[in-house]
């Protein structure tokens, strides 16, 4: 219904779902805790710190890939857009738990690239163009070349004074980018509009 509502108003509603990090609540459950990079995730007390820092899939477990593919299949069918945002942001604990042995061998960023490529392959098999958040790839912008050529990198910076360094370096390495400002409305009741306006203005100028 929401997709239909948007389409009637010439708005493209793009599906967006976590496929790597930001799965804290899922990975604390009895059903899925074994898919967490962090061991002993099940049954721990809820923590706002843990919610933001320890929420990444264990890509060594093939069940994690099957889980993500199932999520994508179920979700993508609800949208007419040919775009699909796989997120893949803030994977802070990648290679620090169950995947440490592989990280010691090839590095956590190589693990990141491997996983994003696998997820993109599945998204593309459904006729969708993948998008992902660019905070992790920005640390090694040259590795954007190792991802699908048509992937869209969503470069974000929500601060009062965003810089253009990541934007420029990713552009120099051939990235297709959407620049994403923020409206300063998280963890509070009222948006910080002065900061939001300044952030949007600067990010738009970089674009």
Where are these regions (language model features)?
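Structural alpha-beta junctions
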Residues: 123-129, 172-177, 205-206
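Aromatic-lined carbohydrate-binding surfaces of glycoside hydrolases
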Residues: 1-153, 183-185
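Glycine-rich loops and low-complexity Gly/Arg-rich segments
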Residues: 38-42, 112, 155-158, 177-180, ...
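Acidic-and-aromatic substrate-binding clefts and catalytic sites of carbohydrate-active enzymes
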Residues: 137-140, 154-165, 185-197
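Active-site clefts of carbohydrate-active enzymes
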Residues: 90-92, 150, 168-197
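Noncatalytic carbohydrate-binding groove/subsite architecture in carbohydrate-active enzymes
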Residues: 145, 162-173
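Short, acidic/polar
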Residues: 69-72, 163-167, 196-206
């Amino acid at each position: 219904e929401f997709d239909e509502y948007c389409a009637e108003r010439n708005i493209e509603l793009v599906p967006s779902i976590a496929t790597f990090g930001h799965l804290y609540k899922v990975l604390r459950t009895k059903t899925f805790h074994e898919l967490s990079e962090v061991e002993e995730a099940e049954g721990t007390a809820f923590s706002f710190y843990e919610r933001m820092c320890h929420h990444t899939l264990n890509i060594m477990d093939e069940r994690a890939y099957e889980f993500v593919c199932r999520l994508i299949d179920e979700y993508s069918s609800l949208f007419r857009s040919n775009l699909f945002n796989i997120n893949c942001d803030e994977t802070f604990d990648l290679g620090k738990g169950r995947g440490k042995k592989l990280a010691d061998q090839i590095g956590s960023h190589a693990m990141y690239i491997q996983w994003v490529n696998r997820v993109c392959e599945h998204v593309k098999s459904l006729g969708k163009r993948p998008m992902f958040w660019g905070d992790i790839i920005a640390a090694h912008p040259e590795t954007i070349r190792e991802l699908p050529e048509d992937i869209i990198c969503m470069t974000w910076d929500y601060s009062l004074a965003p810089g253009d360094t990541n934007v420029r370096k990713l552009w120099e390495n051939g990235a297709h980018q959407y620049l994403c400002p923020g409206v300063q409305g998280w963890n509070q009741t009222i948006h910080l509009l002065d900061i939001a306006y300044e952030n949007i203005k600067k990010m738009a100028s970089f674009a």
